[in-house]
Amino acid sequence: MSVTTADASRSIADQLPADVRITHHTGADIIADPHPWARAYEEVYSHAIDLADHCDPPITERLTRHATRPGFSLVAAHAGDTLAGYLYGYTLPTDSLWWEGLTPDPGPDFVREHPGRTVGLCELLVTRPYRRTRIALALHAAFLAHRTEERAAALIADGNDVMLDRYAKYGFHKVGTVEPYPGWRRHTMVVGPLR
């Protein structure tokens, strides 16, 4: 019998601390109150919040804009009433700018989107007290468990070797580098198959 992504997600969730629960949220949930999510982001990146990567455009603006995109989903980990981390993303549209400026250019067949081809993973974060508790792995598995896209793509800030290694363990491979927004550091684009 094969193990499904949903089965793997349940297995990982079973290994989390007893008080941690995983919850799923829609775009409407985030738009209704983006502040808890923005506060967690600002806490995680407090050491670098003045870098363009983290403040331009502001996280609240990015969250609410992304929450309106088709296929948006946010998966969160809560320890009791405390937000311990989250991952969110959405389905890339056919006119996506996600791949714009990617070097080296992987070619038109790679970057051409069609409905349901790619889910973009926009943000994965875990607050400091809950790191090294498998929450990131659980969020990743829970987010991807119900996705129907062919592949997933994520951007990892230059110098974040921990996340590059983690995504490699998730089955993602590097395809190039890109500046996601004007003035941001270079980010490594990683892509992994979902089917």
Predicted regions and their residues:
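Short amphipathic alpha-helix that is part of the acyltransferase structural core
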Residues: 3-61, 74-83
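A short helix-loop-beta-strand connector motif used in the catalytic cores of GNAT acetyltransferases and
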Residues: 64-76, 92-97, 120
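Short hydrophobic/aromatic beta-strand element in the GNAT-like acyltransferase core
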Residues: 71-76, 86, 118, 123, ...
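Conserved donor-binding loop and adjoining core beta-sheet/short helix segment
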Residues: 78-96, 194
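Conserved acyl-donor/pantetheine-binding loop and adjacent beta-alpha core of acyl/acetyltransferases
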Residues: 88-123, 182
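Conserved GNAT acetyl-CoA-binding A-motif
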Residues: 119, 145-159
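Conserved acetyl-CoA-binding loop-helix of GNAT-fold acetyltransferases
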Residues: 121-126, 132-145, 168-169
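Conserved active-site alpha-helix within GNAT-family acetyltransferase domains
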Residues: 137-138, 151, 158-185
